[in-house]
Amino acid sequence: MAKHIVELTDALSNKIAAGEVVERPASVVKELVENAIDAGSTVIDILVEEAGLNKITIIDNGSGIEEEDVAIAFLRHATSKIKNEADLFRVHTLGFRGEALPSIASVSHLTLETSTGETKGTTISLEGGKIIEQKSGHARKGTQIEVSQLFFNTPARLKYLKSLPTELGNITDILNRLALAHPDISFRFSHNGKPLLQTNGNGDLRQVIAAIYGVSIARKSIPVKAESLDFKISGYAVLPEVNRSNRNYISTIINGRFIKNFALVKAIQEGYHTLLPIGRFPIIVLQIEMDPIIVDVNVHPAKLEVRLSKEKELGQLISQMIKDAFHQLQLIPDGEVSKKQKEQQKSEQIQMSFEENRQPKEPPTLFSKPNIPEYVPSDEIVPKEDDFILETMPTYNPETQPEQVEEQKERIPKMYPIGQMHATYIFAQNENGLYIIDQHAAQERIKYEFYREKIGEVSRELQELLVPIVLEFPSDEYVRLEEQKAKLEEVGVFLENFGQNSFIIRAHPTWFPKDQEEEMLREIIDEALSAPSISIHKLREDTAIMMSCKKSIKANHYLTMQDMEALLDTLREASDPFTCPHGRPVIIQYSTYELEKMFKRVM
């Protein structure tokens, strides 16, 4: 006998919705803090006990809720943020579905105190979604929500929660992202009475970065911005020398909402291409403004994922913005000082200040270093404006004048070699200090730029082979190469069918290394076969990297002084001389000041 279809009760419906909206304590914090942001709050306090399993309290100074709307707020799909279907496609708030409050209330004990500041306030208490009490409350403008005994009526959910430190880490990550998205709001977060995050809400994104990631990271960040007809981007990108082993430090914010978008992350990584080692990822915060009509935020239960109608154009704008911003700078990292030296530097008290708006007389670089010790973090949570200095960095502007670009064309100074260590590292000097150059990485960068340009030219100047090369392949690889013949021709490999599962090659580009033609051809074909589908851009890029790596001098290769001079002079002509194509540093500098400090010539 068929089962009858019945309509679920509101209580059961809310519990089902809670399964998507309220996965863990961090979900509760996210939804309630976003409500506080939507209410126009300028200060939000987040008080958490036992990683949110015991109690979560959110206090804001927002607009509050009218007395007659308080109970309605806990009905499913009751909201003040959208009124009709058209509003759904122009969402200006973080929340809009009306699911959060009833979902949270259905799996917890919840007390809400709220007031618009014009009349007496209202207090309402719920247990498992049922209203227990509603009465008059305080008249302070704003809202305070206390959530306790989370998941008391869904014990199965408790089994799948992680350890308290992990759950606390999830909460902290959510609040960090919200603080980065809203630097104009003061966030004050504490756990078991211990302050963990505090921002001052003055609108300065770099100070928020300092509060979250530390002042040393903020000092290594440069402002970036770009604009098109559809998008306006601003934010801070941290120099490539400071990187992480995962993508967790990439923050993309669209219209005030932190989102996860693989295409935008790829675009950011493309902007850092050849500046970061393989497996390393940047620290970057981008705030993107666009018309809500071209972004759909109603595609994910937690609203973390969005759909963009012009995703490709936005990605290209981001990549070019990052590339151009770093192309204006000298990216020679400072040499590491010893742990003891760092401890001595930390013991010194220094006075530092922001100099964001001061324009330098000369094009700013990261090469120069102020004659001051390292910053010492204080016990305070919020870094104040006079707590640290940030060197003035150029902001990317697509309309940069050609004259300015030309002035910055020489990206590293003249260096004079003085010797070689372990037949691997070149030592050089000038008036600025000591330089250590990885000879393989240096030539790899030079050859990469040469091959990348040659491969991109698609020249038809060919050298005939005295003995044509016949290559045989398994049938599956033969079929794939048939499909990729046009792409291979774009990088100088001309395959002709020659019997079953075979190709013949009769010529190659004139710029192929002499006596290594067959090896290069096979390497390029292997690159094409290494991925099921490869774009011509990716094939050219991978081919240039492969050729530059294999054809550069290696470690344990002795060089004459003339060889070293020639290598360094050629390196100065490279467009990006600071890293090899794999992102490893080419050159490290010890300034004269740092050396004198190490030898106690200056104190």
Curated annotation (Swiss-Prot):
Q: Where is this region: Disordered?
A: 336-372
Give one GO molecular function term. ATP binding
Could you identify this protein by its name? DNA mismatch repair protein MutL
Which gene is the coding source of this polypeptide chain? mutL
Q: Which cysteines are joined by disulfide bonds?
A: none
Q: Quote the biased-composition stretches of kind Basic and acidic residues, using this chain's numbering.
A: 336-346
Family membership noted in the UniProt record: Belongs to the DNA mismatch repair MutL/HexB family.
Keyword set includes Zinc-finger:
no
Q: Which UniProt keywords apply?
A: DNA damage, DNA repair
Q: Which organism is it from?
A: Listeria innocua serovar 6a (strain ATCC BAA-680 / CLIP 11262)
What Pfam families is this protein classified in?
DNA_mis_repair, HATPase_c_3, MutL_C
Under the heading InterPro entries, the entry gives:
DNA_mismatch_repair_CS, DNA_mismatch_repair_MutL, DNA_mismatch_S5_2-like, HATPase_C_sf, MutL/Mlh/PMS, MutL/Mlh/Pms-like, MutL_C, MutL_C_dimsub
Q: Which GO terms describe its cellular component?
A: mismatch repair complex
UniProt KW Phosphoprotein keyword? no
Q: Which HAMAP family match?
A: DNA_mis_repair (MF_00149)
